[in-house]
Curated annotation (Swiss-Prot):
This is Cyclic AMP-dependent transcription factor ATF-1. Belongs to the bZIP family. ATF subfamily. Phosphorylated at Ser-197 by HIPK2 in response to genotoxic stress. This phosphorylation promotes transcription repression of FTH1 and other antioxidant detoxification genes. The CDK3-mediated phosphorylation at Ser-63 promotes its transactivation and transcriptional activities. Phosphorylated at Ser-63 by RPS6KA4 and RPS6KA5 in response to mitogenic or stress stimuli. GO terms for molecular function: DNA-binding transcription factor activity, RNA polymerase II-specific; RNA polymerase II cis-regulatory region sequence-specific DNA binding. Gene3D superfamilies: 1.20.5.170. Residues 214-238 are annotated as: Basic motif. The lineage of its organism: Eukaryota, Metazoa, Chordata, Craniata, Vertebrata. Residues 9-21 have a biased composition (Polar residues). Keywords: Activator, DNA-binding, Isopeptide bond, Nucleus, Phosphoprotein, Transcription, Transcription regulation, Ubl conjugation. Its main location: nucleus. GO terms for cellular component: ATF4-CREB1 transcription factor complex. GO terms for biological process: regulation of transcription by RNA polymerase II. There is a cross-link at K207, K214 (Glycyl lysine isopeptide (Lys-Gly) (interchain with G-Cter in SUMO2)).
Amino acid sequence: MEDSHKSNTSETAPQSGSTVQAAHISHIAQQVSSLSESEESQDSSDSIGSSQKTHGILARRPSYRKILKDLSSEDIRGRKGDGENPGVSAVTSMSVPTPIYQTSTGQYIAIAPNGALQLASPGTDGVQGLQTLTMTNSGSTQQGTTILQYAQTSDGQQILVPSNQVVVQTASGDMQTYQIRTTPSATSLPQTVVMTSPVTLTSQTSKTDDPQLKREIRLMKNREAARECRRKKKEYVKCLENRVAVLENQNKTLIEELKTLKDLYSNKSV
C-alpha cells in the first residue's frame, strides 16, 4: 500500500509542475502580445498625428493660385485708385504771359514760355522781320558746363555762341550779344534779359586777311618743318654711325685673316 501511494504521489508531482509552467508561459505570452499591441497602437497614433500635422501645415500654407489672385487684386485696386485721383499726378497747366523787351536800338525781344526767343525790328507799318530763336535750357546741367549752339547771321554764316546768349544784328551790320540769366528755382520763369557790352563778331575771311595772323601761321609752319628736319638728320647720323661700326668690325676680321694667311705662307716656304 505504501509503495502504491508513493508512486501515485510521484506521478502527481510532475503533473502539477507542468501545469504551473504552462500557466506561467501563457501569462508571459499574454504580456508580450499586450506590449506589441500597445506599441502598434502608439505607432499608428504617431503616424496619424504626423499626417494630421502635415495636413494642417499644407492647409495653412497659401497656394500659388491664391497668391496670384491676391497680387492681381492689389494691382487692380491700385489702378482704380490712380484713376479715381488723377489730380495727384497730373500737372496743372497755366497760361504764362509772354514778356516783351525793347533794346536801345529799338529792336523787340519776346520770350515764349517754351524758351523760344522772337526778335523783331520796328518799321513804319509796325513790327517787321520777326525771327524766332530756340534756346537750349541749361537749368538741369551741372555748374561750370557751357552749352554751345549755332546762330545764323544775315549773310548765311553760322557761328557758335553759348546757350545763354543771344546774338542780334543791327541795321548797320554790327552784331551785339545779349545774355539771358535764368534763376535756379524750377517755379520761377526765365524772364530776365541782361544786355552786355556789344561784341563785334568778324567773319573768318577777315581773320585770315590779318598780316599778323599770317605771320604767326608762317612761323608755326617753319618751326614744325625745322623740327622735322632735325629729327631726320639725327636719324641719318645714327644710321651712318651704325654703318661705320659694322665696317670697322669687318676691317678687323680682314686684318686677322691676312695675318693668318701670311703665317701659313711663311711656314710653307720654310
